[in-house]
Curated annotation (Swiss-Prot):
Transmembrane segments: none annotated. The lineage of its organism: Eukaryota, Fungi, Dikarya, Ascomycota, Saccharomycotina. PROSITE patterns: WD_REPEATS_2, WD_REPEATS_REGION. Keywords: Phosphoprotein, Repeat, WD repeat. Belongs to the WD repeat DGR2 family. This is 2-deoxy-glucose resistant protein 2. Pfam families: WD40 (PF00400). The gene is DGR2. Residues 1-60, 723-748 are annotated as: Disordered. Residues 1-18, 733-744 have a biased composition (Polar residues). The modification Phosphoserine is found at S716. Disruption phenotype: Increases cellular tolerance to 2-deoxy-glucose. Present with 504 molecules/cell in log phase SD medium. WD repeats lie at residues 171-210, 278-316, 318-358, 426-471, 476-515, 651-689.
Amino acid sequence: MFKSKTSTLSYDETPNSNEGDRNATPVNPKEKSQTKHLNIPGDRSRHSSIADSKRSSSRYDGGYSADIIPAQLRFIDNIDYGTRLRKTLHRNSVVSNGYNKLSENDRWYFDLFDRKYFENYLEEPTYIKIFKKKEGLEQFDRMFLAQELKIPDVYKSTTYQGEPAVANSELFKNSICCCTFSHDGKYMVIGCKDGSLHLWKVINSPVKRSEMGRSEKSVSASRANSLKIQRHLASISSHNGSISSNDLKPSDQFEGPSKQLHLYAPVFYSDVFRVFMEHALDILDANWSKNGFLITASMDKTAKLWHPERKYSLKTFVHPDFVTSAIFFPNDDRFIITGCLDHRCRLWSILDNEVSYAFDCKDLITSLTLSPPGGEYTIIGTFNGYIYVLLTHGLKFVSSFHVSDKSTQGTTKNSFHPSSEYGKVQHGPRITGLQCFFSKVDKNLRLIVTTNDSKIQIFDLNEKKPLELFKGFQSGSSRHRGQFLMMKNEPVVFTGSDDHWFYTWKMQSFNLSAEMNCTAPHRKKRLSGSMSLKGLLRIVSNKSTNDECLTETSNQSSSHTFTNSSKNVLQTQTVGSQAIKNNHYISFHAHNSPVTCASIAPDVAIKNLSLSNDLIFELTSQYFKEMGQNYSESKETCDNKPNHPVTETGGFSSNLSNVVNNVGTILITTDSQGLIRVFRTDILPEIRKKIIEKFHEYNLFHLEAAGKINNHNNDSILENRMDERSSTEDNEFSTTPPSNTHNSRPSHDFCELHPNNSPVISGMPSRASAIFKNSIFNKSNGSFISLKSRSESTSSTVFGPHDIPRVSTTYPKLKCDVCNGSNFECASKNPIAGGDSGFTCADCGTILNNFR
């Protein structure tokens, strides 16, 4: 299990409970860490500062510690993974008829790990402590560390023959500069400061997941053998050849496969898929094409073309200076666009290996992006804070502005260089990241600009005006890139930070125009702080009194409606002439070093992961499937039910086809020490409670069954008790007829499973059955019934975790003579019935001899 070394908070802790703690610690430790961890060239105390921050993290972070380990589970036996899987699947095929609507594909993983270990984890989960400032995003609730990947120190470039790196760079030779996923979601590429390029593959099949478990087990065994040999050699040298048994015993963490822990919810294979070593210096950018090719930009003045299935680069594009950006043309990946420090943006033809078009922007190019969806426009960011918009075809100039100079913003004049028009040259801030997205509200292109002055801004490229400003994170010399993503239909912007934290904001300007168009002009009542605009519009749309307003809004040809909407636009522009300052972020302490990159797994990567029997996906999808079945059944009987039982709680959707919602958020962060951390959202609290309840039923059932089997005198004792209970029930039900058959059931909770090949002794009354739930999560639709019989042999029966009695069947035409119950189950080959099928009462256990 994972637990923070300094935090013992539960998953449902709210920021209000730690308000005083957080108010005392959020500013001071961050300001202090920022002065420590700025990447100052030539600062030889950098390494010691990191060590000091690690030692003092638990003292100053107020419980927001990054000293965490990935969540792990323990397997239950010593047989290999494949054998255990085959045995479990075989047993499921045998007992599958004993389950009512329980998915056979979602039961096998309960046999793969220690249920007690997993139950302890479910009862006491310890999630990442997240700081929420004024508002939170449910997509990042219940976050835990799922996996850690490390860039090894052994990789060194063999092609670079230039001058050695400075001492400060050697401390961060494994620093990760870029991280991105392929379009098919199969690979994640990592570009490092030492020029190495690493490809990690997403787990996409159950077989590969099992192979991953076996490889981890073999590594553990080899480490145990190595430790045994070392102790053997040490004992020979210290004891003159005398060896004791304790000397050959490995440590407790390598005692064998039964003690081996495995990751709870890994995303990538533990071993890197491929490593490319052709770049000599820092890899600054990497981009995937729609056909699976990869282009990288490096400080060695080259851009290289790769493919995951090839061991070497396919082509090299030489530049006169550092290549800071490289990107594929979306509609045709035979062309790439690169940005260089020689002020020129180039469009290359890969087949011809030559420059087709070029544009000189008179400034150092530090970032580059294309407009969605077809890359019609090319947007360039420069060292001094200028933005250039070009037509991709021919790289023709369209417009430009400066991110902080308001005199260049919101103008209709599109000068070639803003400084030539206004007579001054701006110096900074440096643009470190760009991302363009299309606004479906006003049909305009919007640009996310990240600068090294710790700001992320959103610009409307049509008006060249800032719409929103995100603040809170810390940026120095790192190439932080604020990224926009729609998560559960909510616009989110996220980034890493030099203060070791991860930050994310909910975009407030995304639906700005939609709010202006949808707001009723005659409503003068102001919005309350507890009611959002979406919620107010939803209430208004549901009321019949607003039909006239809705009609006017939908009729675009009406002059009256157009006049009102124009007034709203003018009023909103007057109020919102300045950019929205958004500091309502949520964050958590992700690393003990500056966080260089942050990326959220795309939908295609999550879908690939769901194909590998991912535990979180299997449990969540099974839960919503059964909850949906219960709702559909209840809806048939009660059509006017106001509330839907399956809600989108914690960011998960009840739609079974929505695989992404069932898996949850997968966040990847990297730092300057070469560490890759994978964070995930855990299963819902409702799912945890259901699994814990089912585990308790399993444990009680098997404990009671095992105790009765091991007792040699148990059969005779039970026979006497059953005889006494049978006579008591005869007297009771003969005098007072029961009004409810459910209330007449005996109080016995559990019973043993009757094997199919075990004969039933004549004259032995059947014991009442146990009431089990229909499946892991939903409520019971009936009782699981089994016969309590005595076998002629004295051999004991071993119960598996899924050896549950069969489901009872209701026969309305039959009636019990003892309890007047109508629930019966079929007992095949009953000797009392002459070898034919017989029936027993599910309520009192009486054998029915009359079948008329």
